[in-house]
Amino acid sequence: MNKSQNSGIVEQFVNTVMGVKPGNKSQSLNTSIATTQELDIKAVLVYTLGTILQILVMILVLLGMEKLVMFIDNSSFPSWVSTLLAGLFFALLSIRSRIFSLLDNTRSRQTYDQVIRPRWSPPPLAFPIVWMTIAVLRVIYSVLIWQQMNHQFLVLPLILFVVHLALGDTWNTIFTVERRLGAAVPVVILGPWLSAVVVTAIYWQTNSIAGMTLSFSCVWLTVAAVLVFRIWQLNGSEPLYPLKLTLVDR
């Protein structure tokens, strides 16, 4: 098996785990274009309500997990059962938090493959690999926080964590799915990046090891935010808000 075959297997494995669909360069990027500079108020409302609903659903799931683990801890199950269950739950949240979102959160390389990128931009495969690494770290630091909080899920650090995940999913909808390169700039800064900084600070106060582990994602999101900004600059610098789109025939 040659090097390229090994690389292909690794890429397929990583993309499968992270749910990333490979880009198709022959496929049109989307069937809508902005013909005016008018703010798409409907899109803003959809993003806002979609994010809020996802956060509420995940908070309810946290509550459900707390009740389930409380039952397990008060039963005759071995002590490791609740820890294993918590780890699996945080793994699901870290890799597939988008299942709780009503928005289209398809993970695809299509946008990244087709836009103009700076020379220093990482190769497309780097993103799912890095995010898979971050997902593993998320499981570790979330379990640490959960243990620090006496097996409680409905606590401030974990609530802020699911808020961070929801904001990241909404950004994915804006950038990857709908290719709104302008709106993606402020959203990536005020959403995933800022929330990661806040969560890191709260985690650090609760458990310093968890805070240090989470800081890696802050570094990566800083790189990602700069990359999103440069992609916006290189692809026309459209307004930094969602533009009203018009359907076109391709």
Where are the language model's segments positioned?
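Aromatic-rich, lipid-facing transmembrane alpha helices and their immediate juxtamembrane interface loops
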Residues: 2-250
